[in-house]
Amino acid sequence: ISHVGGTKIPTTLLRGGRVHMHHGFNPEAVLDTIAAERITTTLLVPTMVNILLDHPKLDQTDLSSLELLIYGAAPMSPTRLLEGLERIGPVFCQLYGQTEGYPLTVLRKGDHNKDDPGLFAACGHPVSSVRIALLDEEGQEVPGGEVGEICAQGPQIMDAYWQRPEQTEEVFAHGWLHTGDMAWADDRGYLYIVDRKKDMIITGGFNVFPREVEDVITTDRDIAMA
């Protein structure tokens, strides 16, 4: 497979493990497979996690074999993440990156503390092999606590887009890979994505990011996704 899920297959096979691949996402089939095959690791996007949380069979399914549930590719509501920890277990780990560079940050299992959910809105801490900077439009690092674009340098960064020199030059402005994700960093170095750069709304002189609104909406337990 061509996306980041493929990076998990060789290491599993090299350790003598088995890989179960479904043709599509069927929540009941996923739950049944985890229980029957004693699956230890799976990779899901937040929408899939939300669907599993809403499935009537979840609480009757034996998920005790599951040691690691990796999620990524989109933000996850902190409210739903807390629900996942309570109902699925302390197995969540977030990896952030993109096809042009992966992984860039990790929010480890130990960071998913349901008694201290302050990091649930974070996309993690930079992995050891990458250098991350939050840059403004001029390619300068923003002051601590302010929002800037996540930019990266490291061995896992692509060289170029195939036969697309103009796009390559644009995405590597100022010598950094520009992810298009806007974020701020806390004093420990954890990054908090506020939204995609192109999704920012300027209204009344303020920058409004849809994700901030969505996270507030999903604090209502009657709302599954926003």
Each model region followed by its residue ranges:
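Conserved AMP-binding
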Residues: 1-2
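Gly/Ser/Thr-rich phosphate-binding loop
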Residues: 9, 14-17, 31, 39-44, ...
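ATP-dependent adenylate-forming carboxylate-activation enzymes
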Residues: 17-37, 46-48, 208-213
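Generic structural signal for well-ordered beta-strand positions
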Residues: 20, 142-143, 186, 192
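Structural motif
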Residues: 23, 37, 56, 221-224
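Alpha-helix capping/helix-boundary segments
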Residues: 26, 48-49, 76, 157
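AMP-binding/adenylate-forming catalytic core of the ANL superfamily
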Residues: 34, 42-45, 154, 159-160, ...
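Adenylate-forming AMP-binding core of the ANL superfamily, especially NRPS adenylation
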Residues: 75, 107, 114-163, 171-174, ...
